[in-house]
Design a protein with these regions (language model features):
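C-terminal accessory subdomains/tails of enzymes that are appended
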Residues: 21, 67, 78-89, 102-123, ...
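Glycine-rich FAD pyrophosphate-binding loop
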Residues: 9-30
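Gly/Ala-rich phosphate-binding loop of Rossmann-like dinucleotide-binding domains
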Residues: 5, 9-10, 148
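Residues forming the Rossmann-fold NAD(P)(H) cofactor-binding site
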Residues: 2, 143
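A conserved short coil-to-beta-strand element within the FAD-binding core of flavoproteins
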Residues: 158-174
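Dinucleotide-binding Rossmann-like beta1-alpha1 core, especially the glycine-rich loop
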Residues: 33-116, 249, 386-387
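A structural signal for short hydrophobic beta-strand segments in well-ordered beta-sheet cores
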Residues: 162-165, 250-251, 331
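Core beta-strand elements of the Rossmann-like FAD/NAD(P) dinucleotide-binding domain
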Residues: 182-193
Length: 495
């Protein structure tokens, strides 16, 4: 949805984006933090999807270098045939990326492998293979897209829910009824076209348009756990090419932590806060433990989170296997003229948006205008950033945050002794990033909830007080915000 807003507004179209909760509240903030082509899909022979994703990976790296970086991934080899097998396959992966590649895949000796990833299991290790993919911060990218859309004239509003669609006498959608979910106001807007890009909720909007609409999405739950970066021991990521359920498993350095995941559990229900299953958590700990010298335990988990992939439903709706559910995106157009886009992944968001805007513009008769996002610098663009401090995620906006602290030294105070989040980051989130709640700040503006849920709970009262002063809220609001966030954060902590 944010990608569509950026694409359409940068072409000069008038755009309104409404989000029922906060930007990236659900799936978009709960990824494996990768911008990648998908090695697993290459193994499955889905070459066209891999090529598209690799090219989009390169474009995203070029358009937002402050948020996307080259990450070295290590595959440890424990059998004689694995090093030549994976080296050949990953060299093909590199070739498919063409000029948008990030680096060459190479075989490694045992010594080189352990230098890259000291935490890798030493016993029976023969060597390894290194390949390159992208790593990013998902919700910070979402906020960057919101700001980029705004820079091009789009109106983006969070906590604004579509409650019904308005149609003209011909049955075509010409407007929508909206509800402010924080303040309770209701509104109506007139529109020429509607793009339904609501992730796992696309079916709800389609049924709002046409109650008998067949479901287009099959949710699949992916769980991740976050542990200390010492489990990996280096700056490179771990890739386990085949777990017992046939997936790959990643261990990715991220903001001084390590993200381990993911799972692939088909579900029939949607939730803004899906709950990780015990068996999913145990699966990740077990599989990671088979490849790491230090075996992660439940007591080592700093945060656990689950997200729902909006996979395009298979032709046979009774299929239970997520392997049969397409990772490609699909576009549907209803009789009323609403365009729905579903499937896909973070890496290909820009391509999905380009296709959606091309189609909706033709559908409603807008003047054809070329897409400009393939080589468009996103908000905050900065080529060189210091990734040792939190401020790098803001790109060029970090200078303005530094100016706040220069004008008032108290804004440089840390929110928590163990992290570099500062009072100024909360002020900035409220003034410039549309943060409305403590959760918005601690989950998606700074990533404390996903990095260390207990520490985030300790930050909540301070954040609530800062926001209350900035937003003119009373003590009751502060108390309610801390209570709500504490109840939420408990779901990110293992008992």
């Amino acid at each position: 949805g944010l990608g569509v807003a950026v694409d359409a507004s940068s072409r000069g179209y008038r755009v309104l984006l409404v989000e029922q909760h906060d930007f990236a509240k659900a799936t978009s903030s709960r990824s494996t933090k990768l911008v990648h082509g998908g090695v697993r899909y290459l193994q499955q022979g889905d070459v066209s999807m891999v090529v598209e994703a690799l090219h989009e990976r390169g474009r995203l790296w070029r358009n937002a270098p402050h948020l996307v970086k080259d990450m070295r991934f290590i595959i440890g080899n424990y059998r004689w045939w694995e090093r030549p097998f994976y080296t050949i396959g990953l060299c093909c992966y590199d070739l498919l990326a063409g000029r948008l590649g990030l680096g060459r895949s190479l075989p490694l000796s045992k010594k080189q492998t352990l230098k890259e990833l000291p935490g890798l299991l030493h016993d029976h290790l023969r060597g390894g293979v290194v390949y390159h993919d992208g790593q990013f911060d998902d919700s910070r990218m979402a906020i960057t897209l919101m700001q980029s859309a705004h820079d091009h004239g789009a109106i983006c509003i969070n906590y604004m829910k579509v409650t019904s669609l308005i149609k003209n006498d011909s049955g075509k959608i010409c407007g929508a009824a909206l509800e402010d979910t924080l303040e309770g106001g209701t509104y109506e807007v007139n529109v020429k076209g509607v793009v339904n890009a609501t992730g796992v909720y696309v079916d709800d909007i389609m049924q709002m348009d046409k109650p008998e609409s067949r479901k287009k999405v099959r949710p699949s739950q992916g769980v991740h756990i976050v542990v200390d970066a010492a489990f990996l021991g280096g700056n490179s990521a771990l890739m386990i090419p085949k777990t017992r359920d046939g997936r790959v498993l990643f261990g990715v350095p991220w903001h001084g932590k390590a993200v381990l995941g993911t799972t692939d559990t088909p579900l029939n229900e949607n939730s803004l806060e899906p709950k990780p299953l015990d068996e999913e958590i145990d699966f990740i700990l077990d599989q990671a433990g088979q490849y790491l010298t230090r075996k992660p335990k439940r007591s080592d988990v700093l945060s656990v989170f689950a997200g729902l992939r909006p996979l395009a439903a298979p032709t046979h709706s009774d299929s239970k296997k997520t392997k049969e559910i397409s990772r490609n995106h699909k576009i549907y157009v209803s009789d009323s003229g609403m365009l729905t886009i579903t499937g896909g992944k973070w890496t290909t968001y820009r391509q999905m948006a380009e296709e959606a805007v091309n189609k909706v513009a033709a559908l409603i008769g807008l003047e054809p205008r070329a897409c400009v996002t393939r080589k468009m610098q996103l908000h905050g663009y900065r080529e060189e950033v210091d990734r040792s401090v939190w401020d790098y995620v803001y790109g060029s906006d970090a200078d303005q945050i530094a100016a706040l602290i220069e004008n008032d030294a108290s804004l440089g105070e840390l929110l928590h002794i163990g992290y570099t989040f500062r009072v100024a980051h909360v002020i900035w989130a409220v003034r410039e990033e549309m943060a409305q709640t403590v959760e918005d700040v601690l989950a998606r503006r700074v990533r404390a909830l996903f990095m260390d849920a207990r520490a985030a709970m300790e930050m909540a009262p301070r954040v609530a007080a800062i926001m209350a002063r900035e937003m003119g809220k009373d003590k009751n609001w502060e108390t309610e915000q801390v209570k709500n966030f504490t109840n939420l954060a408990k779901n990110y902590i293992l008992a």
